[in-house]
Regions:
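Hydrophobic residues within beta-strands of alpha/beta enzymes
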Residues: 1, 35-37, 74, 169, ...
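Histidine-acidic metal/acid-base catalytic patches
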Residues: 28, 70, 124-143, 147-222
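Active-site acidic/histidine proton-transfer and metal-coordination neighborhood
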Residues: 26, 44-141, 150
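Glycine-rich, proline-tolerant flexible connector loops at the mouths of alpha/beta enzymes
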Residues: 1-24, 28, 79-85, 178
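Catalytic-core regions built around general acid/base machinery
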Residues: 17-30, 96-103, 158, 192-196
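Structural motif corresponding to alpha-helix initiation and N-cap regions
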Residues: 13-21, 49-52, 56-60, 124, ...
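Short, solvent-exposed loop/turn segments at secondary-structure boundaries
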Residues: 11-15, 46-53, 85-89, 153-154, ...
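Active-site beta-loop-alpha junctions enriched in small/polar residues
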Residues: 3-6, 39-42, 79-81, 114-118, ...
Length: 222
């Protein structure tokens, strides 16, 4: 599983000691393992200095949690650009991601970048730009087709651009009206993407995201 919240609390709000004492024994007893840690790290404004400093401390704790649970990946984002032109944020985004990378270096844990609406890496061109600029084995990519639909990007185009660098997939779908829908009924191009992954012999993780029902529950499925 890929935990976002554990026992009613965001995974990033746990200290290592608290997680080790309260949560890990339950996971161990029930045989639950993490494919990645669904952290919100990087989901702050690019100019939010206080928020970034807080998240660096949280990331350090998450690295210890990841090692404890035998988890290889910590999901991260590339900062909200707000009202700015994303092109004006490039250097700062890459610099901050490199700061985050220093925190995981040598731990055996990798940063897993997810494309997300309104963060710098919300379109495949900028995701690839980030990936190439960082150019480190401990910075890898997670592909979310639905999030690309939310950004008016064709997921097939994004997949073809990034498929050689993606190690992890989030599975949810979205209609052309930006409404979350059952996988395979939206614009996520899943028949193509899954077919291509089968041809390529993909053996990595895929995470279903049932929490996204809340975005669609009061909207028509179209």
């Amino acid at each position: 599983m890929c935990p976002r919240n554990v026992d009613g609390k965001n995974i990033a709000d746990y200290t290592f000691e608290e997680f080790k004492e309260k949560i890990f024994p339950v996971l161990k007893k029930e045989g639950v393992k993490f494919s990645s840690i669904g952290s919100p790290i990087g989901k702050v404004g690019i100019d939010d200095e206080e928020g970034f400093e807080k998240q660096k401390k949280q990331l350090a704790e998450l690295v210890k949690i990841a090692k404890l649970t035998g988890c290889e990946y910590i999901r991260v984002f590339s900062f909200f650009y707000g009202d700015k032109n994303p092109k004006d944020c490039t250097e700062k985004v890459i610099a901050r991601l490199k700061e985050m990378l220093k925190i995981v270096k040598g731990s055996g844990v990798k940063l897993l970048h997810e494309n997300e609406k309104k963060v710098y890496g919300d379109v495949p061109e900028r995701v690839l730009e980030i990936y190439n600029a960082i150019n480190d084995e401990d910075f890898v990519l997670c592909f979310d087709a639905s999030n690309y639909v939310q950004c008016d990007v064709n997921p097939k185009t994004a997949f073809d651009m990034l498929k050689d660098y993606v190690v992890y997939y989030h599975i949810k779908d979205c209609s052309k009206y930006k409404v979350e829908v059952p996988v395979g009924t939206g614009e996520g191009c899943y028949p193509y993407i899954l077919g291509e992954l089968k041809k390529r012999g993909y053996h990595g993780f895929m995470t279903l995201e049932p929490h996204t029902f809340k975005y669609a529950i009061f909207k028509p499925i179209v």
